[in-house]
Structure formats: structure tokens, C-alpha cells
Amino acid sequence: PTWALNLFDLLIDLYNEPNMHEGQWGYGTVHHVAFRVSDDEHQRAILQRLRDAGHDVTTMKDRNYFHSLYFRDPNGVNFEIATDPPGFLHDESVDELGTTLMLPPFLQDRRDEVEAQLADISV
């Protein structure tokens, strides 16, 4: 059996085995598949198509650099619909991109904890 999803004028056809056990999270598994859309208006149109087709879709999540919606396929894989705006240049210039760790506002108070988990990278 297959599960078809028509988004962005692109047909996504996935194999669905209803009696198979859902996989476990860990190394080598897919956490989510993200699709890019041009803006919030395009995202709202896709949200409506998904809901009209009976899918359970999250409300819009503001990820500081983009806006996201999430839903799952019958196998439990999480799909994301993410907008281009506001983009990565809304809080730093092209010349500064990647020179510091930029965190969304909700993680700023945990900066030390987040940075302590990152491995040093030399370029």
C-alpha cells in the first residue's frame, strides 16, 4: 500500500505498511523531512490543503529565521513546511554569517549550556 501526498505541485508517494511496528529513534533514523516554501501565504495555502485532506497539522511555529508547520505521515515520519522569510540575514550581515552562534530568543538564557554541548571546530 502507498500513501500519496500532493504538495507544491509535487506528488510525494510513500510506502505504507499499516501492520509494521513504528521505528525507534536513534542513529540512522529520519527525524523529519523539510520542504521549503516561499512565504507565509504559500504556507497557509498548503496548511489548508493538508487539513482539507484530513491531516493533523500543527499551528505555525516561529523558528526566528523561518516559520514552520509539522505533520506526520502514516509511518510516523515528521514532515516540515518551512518558509524562506524572515531569513538568516534578519539579525546579522552576510559578512558576519557563521562567525558566532546565533540562538533564538527562547534559548538565549541557556547559551552557556548549549555552547558546552558543542564540539570545537577549527576552520
Where are these regions (language model features)?
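Glyoxalase I/VOC metalloenzyme domain signal
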Residues: 2-56, 72-123
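Conserved S-adenosyl-L-methionine
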Residues: 58-62
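Short acidic/glycine-enriched loop/turn segments that link adjacent beta-strands
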Residues: 63-67
